[in-house]
Curated annotation (Swiss-Prot):
The protein's name: Inhibitor of growth protein 4
Gene3D superfamilies: 6.10.140.1740, Zinc/RING finger domain, C3HC4 (zinc finger)
Residue runs in coiled coils: 25-118
Zinc finger (PHD-type): 196-245
Entry-linked Pfam families: ING (PF12998)
A GO cellular-component term linked to this record: cytosol
SUPFAM superfamilies: FYVE/PHD zinc finger
Family: Belongs to the ING family.
Organism this protein belongs to: Homo sapiens
Molecular function per GO: histone H3K4me3 reader activity; methylated histone binding; transcription coactivator activity; zinc ion binding
Length: 249
C-alpha cells in the first residue's frame, strides 16, 4: 500500500476525533459549572444552618443537614463523571495513536519488502551481465585470431564494454538484507509503558470504571466487569478489598 493510501486511511479514521474531543471537553466544563453551582448552594445552606441553628427545630436542622449531605453527594457524582470522561478521552486519543503506530509499522514492512524484491532483481541482473560478458570475451578471442586489425580493435571494444558492465551496479540500488517481517510483529503493538494501570486486574483504563469511596484505597479505580457491576450503584461504593477491611473493623 502506498504512503498516500496509509495517510488517507489514517486521516479518515481521525476525521471525527476533534468533534468527539470537543464534546467531551464541553461535558466536563458543564460538570464543572454544575459542581460550582452546588458548592454555592452548599455554602448558602451552611450559612443558613449556622446563623439560625438555635432557632431551628430538630426536624428543620436534620432537613438542612440532609440537603447539605445530598448536595455533597451530587458534587462527588459530578467529580466521578468528570474523571470517567477524562479517562474516555485519554483512551480515545490513545487508540488513534496506536492506530498510527500500527500503520507506520505496516508501511515500514512494505518498504522493507520492496527493498528485498529490488535486491533480488539487482542480483539476477548482475548474473545475466556476467554471462553476457563471457560470451563477448569469446567473440573477442575469435576476432584476434583473424588478423592484426581485428586483434587490436576487438580487445579495446571488449574492454570498454567490460568496464561499463563492472561499473553499472554502483549506480543501481544497493543490496540490503532484512529479517523476515511477520504480520504478528506489526499487529501486536506494545502497550504504552507510561500508561497507568488500575483495578484488580492491573490493566489500563478501558470501558466503564468506578471509583472506590475509600480515600485510602490503593487502587482507586475498577472496571465494571472485574467487580461484577453492570450499572453505577447509588450511594457510596467500596471495592472488594476495602469492603473486607471495613467488615473487620
Amino acid at each position: 500500500m502506498a504512503a498516500g493510501m496509509y495517510l488517507e486511511h489514517y486521516l479518515d479514521s481521525i476525521e471525527n476525533l476533534p468533534f468527539e474531543l470537543q464534546r467531551n471537553f464541553q461535558l466536563m466544563r458543564d460538570l464543572d459549572q454544575r459542581t460550582e453551582d452546588l458548592k454555592a448552594e452548599i455554602d448558602k445552606l451552611a450559612t443558613e444552618y449556622m446563623s439560625s441553628a438555635r432557632s431551628l427545630s430538630s426536624e428543620e436542622k436534620l432537613a438542612l443537614l440532609k440537603q447539605i449531605q445530598e448536595a455533597y453527594g451530587k458534587c462527588k457524582e459530578f467529580g466521578d463523571d468528570k474523571v470517567q470522561l477524562a479517562m474516555q478521552t485519554y483512551e480515545m486519543v490513545d487508540k488513534h495513536i496506536r492506530r498510527l503506530d500500527t500503520d507506520l509499522a505496516r508501511f515500514e514492512a512494505d518498504l522493507k519488502e520492496k527493498q528485498i524484491e529490488s535486491s533480488d532483481y539487482d542480483s539476477s541482473s548482475s548474473k545475466g551481465k556476467k554471462k553476457g560478458r563471457t560470451q563477448k570475451e569469446k567473440k573477442a578471442a575469435r576476432a584476434r585470431s583473424k588478423g592484426k586489425n581485428s586483434d587490436e580493435e576487438a580487445p579495446k571494444t571488449a574492454q570498454k564494454k567490460l568496464k561499463l558492465v563492472r561499473t553499472s551496479p554502483e549506480y543501481g540500488m544497493p543490496s540490503v538484507t532484512f529479517g523476515s517481517v511477520h504480520p504478528s510483529d506489526v499487529l501486536d503493538m506494545p502497550v504504552d509503558p507510561n500508561e497507568p494501570t488500575y483495578c484488580l486486574c492491573h490493566q489500563v483504563s478501558y470501558g466503564e470504571m468506578i471509583g472506590c469511596d475509600n480515600p485510602d484505597c490503593s487502587i482507586e479505580w475498577f472496571h465494571f466487569a472485574c467487580v461484577g457491576l453492570t450499572t453505577k450503584p447509588r450511594g457510596k461504593w467500596f471495592c472488594p478489598r476495602c469492603s473486607q477491611e471495613r467488615k473487620k473493623k
